[in-house]
């Protein structure tokens, strides 16, 4: 590992949506580094990525790269690539922060949301890998964690409204192209999604499991338990909607302890990573388009659920490419630099 006080940072999958966002956020946050390396497949070798205000970096080939003098590598290349290259980088002494689903269920890999469980980072040396949670889980838990600290969450029922960018650039292109085709009275082409996504909603994200859940719903259940509390029960319905950026969630919580709404609002106001906009009037809530490009998880529509004891409903929205992926990995890197690499 490099000995410089300023870390050497690599961004793997730098040409993708999340990788580019990582580069932008590193620049926005003015993170001090000795070198910043952009890595991708051999197809992109030698190409230039523009990021930040007026910076650029030349892409190197991931397969040819030696991680032994790199301090931190942020991986966003897809699970298959991470499964091959992240362990290699970790064995060479580089700390890997992985954005894919591959390591999330590994008991020896911390699954971390910066505002929720940063203390879990203490165990990263077991494999030198840290995992970033699913984007919907992350947005929800930033809002749920401070409530759990005060009232102890017993059960969560959540319905998600997830943008197409969560399925990658090809999915966003498909929504755009299908929308154009419909207006032009042309045939709709389906490639990325099994059904038309334009002007439609699909209750199907990732593969179906034997019990009828989709894997996305299973992820939310398992990741919530690993990150927050094994005793919390959760059921999810995950839906893809024809929105380009930002995921929205309708969250219903049953607490073990009683609460009043003023307490909830005060907690939300004081919690890191959250912004409450809830006026109980027209335009008094946040929508996906308003959260796009911004860091916070926004909470709105806060109200009691009168059908169960200690029940609460709220709406939360966050940019899935920023807080749901890129921002959290950079926040983790900041914690590592400050608390684990500074000595």
PLM features: what roles do these ranges have?
Residues 245-250:
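Conserved glycine-rich beta-strand-loop-beta hairpin in the small C-terminal domain of fold type I
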Residues 275-301:
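A glycine-rich dinucleotide-binding beta-alpha-beta segment and adjacent secondary-structure elements
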Residues 128-139, 212-221, 226, 324-328:
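A glycine-rich, Thr/Ser-enriched phosphate-binding loop motif common to dinucleotide/cofactor-binding enzymes
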Residues 263, 268-278:
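A common structural junction motif
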Residues 252-254:
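Short hydrophobic/aromatic beta-strand micro-patches
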Residues 198-244:
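Oxyanion-binding "anion nests"
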Residues 239-242, 318-323:
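Glycine-rich phosphate/pyrophosphate-binding beta-alpha loops
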Residues 2-197, 233, 257, 266, ...:
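N-terminal Rossmann-like NAD(P) cofactor-binding subdomain of oxidoreductases
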């Amino acid at each position: 590992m490099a000995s410089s006080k300023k870390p050497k940072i690599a961004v793997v999958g730098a040409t993708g949506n999340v990788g580019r966002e990582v580069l932008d956020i590193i620049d926005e946050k003015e993170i001090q580094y000795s070198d910043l390396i952009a890595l991708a497949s051999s197809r992109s070798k030698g190409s230039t990525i523009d990021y930040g205000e007026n910076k650029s970096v030349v892409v190197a080939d991931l397969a040819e790269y030696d991680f032994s003098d790199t301090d931190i590598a942020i991986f966003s290349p897809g699970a298959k690539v991470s499964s091959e290259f992240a362990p290699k980088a970790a064995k060479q002494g580089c700390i890997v922060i992985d954005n894919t689903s591959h390591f999330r269920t590994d008991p020896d890999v911390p699954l971390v949301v910066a505002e929720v469980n940063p203390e879990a980072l203490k165990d990263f040396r077991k494999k030198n890998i840290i995992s970033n949670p699913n984007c919907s889980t992350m947005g929800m838990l930033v809002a749920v964690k401070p409530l759990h600290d005060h009232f102890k969450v017993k059960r969560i029922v959540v319905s998600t409204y997830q943008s197409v960018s969560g399925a990658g650039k090809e999915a966003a292109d498909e929504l755009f192209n299908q929308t154009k085709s419909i207006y032009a009275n042309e045939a709709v082409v389906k490639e990325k999604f099994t059904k038309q996504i334009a002007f439609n909603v699909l209750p199907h994200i990732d593969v179906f499991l034997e019990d009828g859940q989709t894997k996305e719903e299973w992820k939310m259940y398992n990741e919530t338990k690993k990150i927050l509390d094994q005793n919390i029960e959760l059921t999810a319905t995950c839906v893809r909607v024809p929105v380009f950026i930002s995921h929205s969630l309708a969250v219903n919580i049953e607490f073990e302890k009683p609460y009043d709404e003023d307490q909830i609002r005060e907690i939300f106001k004081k919690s890191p990573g959250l912004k409450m906009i809830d006026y109980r009037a027209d335009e008094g809530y946040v929508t996906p388009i308003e959260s796009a490009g911004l860091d916070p998880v926004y909470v709105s529509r806060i109200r009691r659920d009168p059908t169960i004891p200690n029940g609460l409903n709220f709406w939360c929205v966050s940019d899935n490419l920023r807080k749901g992926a890129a921002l959290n990995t950079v926040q983790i890197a900041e914690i590592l630099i400050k608390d684990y690499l500074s000595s």
